């Protein structure tokens, strides 16, 4: 699951078609959980610098169930899409934060999205 999410969010950032995976279809459905007009506000609330990827912990939004997890993934993907591709982005920090917030719900997420662990 970690590898899939990393590949998906990086793909959303650069849009390289050779990086596309059919498993991304289910993850793209999560986009409807976050309104495009909210992304600028979310980026502002994350107080990001030019070298930051999505910093979800700065939103102070709890993750208490699989729906919260799906929203965090959607926020990460949309922020990654909108910040643009730059070589200096510190993706490791962003992914560490994301996974720390959602790892408790990985199995539930897999079952919800794909019907199995």
From Swiss-Prot:
Protein family according to the UniProt entry: Belongs to the poxviridae OPG035 family.
Residues annotated as signal peptide: none
Protein name stated in the entry: Protein OPG035
Gene: OPG035
InterPro entries: Orthopox_N1, Poxvirus_Bcl-2-like, Poxvirus_sf
Biological process per Gene Ontology, one example term: symbiont-mediated perturbation of host defense response
Induction field: Expressed in the early phase of the viral replicative cycle.
Organismal lineage: Viruses, Varidnaviria, Bamfordvirae, Nucleocytoviricota, Pokkesviricetes
Keywords recorded for this protein, A-Z: Early protein, Host-virus interaction, Inhibition of host NF-kappa-B by virus, Modulation of host cell apoptosis by virus, Viral immunoevasion
Reported function: Bcl-2-like protein which contributes to virulence by preventing host NF-kappa-B activation in response to pro-inflammatory stimuli such as TNF-alpha or IL1B.
Organism the protein comes from: Variola virus (isolate Human/India/Ind3/1967) (VARV)
């Amino acid at each position: 699951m970690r590898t899939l999410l990393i590949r998906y969010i990086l793909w959303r950032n650069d849009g390289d078609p050779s990086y596309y995976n059919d498993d991304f279809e289910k993850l793209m459905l999560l986009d409807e959980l976050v309104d495009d007009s909210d992304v600028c506000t979310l980026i502002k609330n994350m107080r990001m610098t030019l070298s930051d990827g999505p910093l979800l912990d700065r939103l102070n939004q709890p993750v208490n169930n699989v729906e919260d997890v799906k929203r965090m993934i959607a926020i990460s993907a949309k922020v990654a899409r909108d910040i643009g591709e730059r070589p200096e982005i510190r993706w490791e920090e962003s992914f560490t934060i994301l996974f720390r917030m959602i790892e408790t719900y990985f199995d539930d997420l897999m079952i919800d999205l794909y019907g199995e662990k």
